[in-house]
Amino acid sequence: MTDHGFALFETAVGLCGVAWGRNGILGVQLPEGDATRTRARLRRRFPQARETEAPEPVRSAVGAIQALLSGEPRDLSQVALDWTGVGAFERRVYEVARAIRPGATLTYGEVAARIGETPLAARDVGQALGRNPFPIVVPCHRVVGAGGKSGGFSARGGAATKLKLLRIEGAEAAGPPTLFD
């Protein structure tokens, strides 16, 4: 792959972005409202990257992301990611999330159990997912709170965006948490 670049691309949920380096995708950016804001977010996150045409492996990943966000089930688990700067705990969490198929969900506690942690680590799992640099490719939106509650989501629109992504994939979540959840 070419050295550090980024590109914007249209999806059914809005204009997204992707940044890449020699070892794979560095990050995915969900829509920020318009091209200017999405581009600015990518430039802040990846100051070493310049806007350019994506190389073939990235174009292939973008096509799969576009299809998934249009409601076509796609497996993105083979998309090459550049794990530089991702901690060991986060990587374990992201690898479990990558294995969740479209239309399915796991709870934060179930992810914690799958990486060998106690249920008390569910909050740590949520924090790791909140730092996910690869949304959609690492489908953090498929991890929900206990009882099917949506839980948080760090992208623009918060839990409403998470619920929209789950609906596109045909998954169910109970909605945003209330004061009593």
Residue map of PLM features:
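Basic nucleic-acid-binding alpha-helical/helix-turn surface characteristic of O6-alkylguanine DNA
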Residues: 1-120, 168-181
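N-terminal alpha-helical segment
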Residues: 93, 145-146
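Helix-turn-helix DNA-binding helix
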Residues: 121-125
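Major-groove DNA-recognition helix of helix-turn-helix-type DNA-binding domains
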Residues: 131, 137-138
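…primarily DNA-binding HTH/wHTH and HhH modules…
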Residues: 146-181
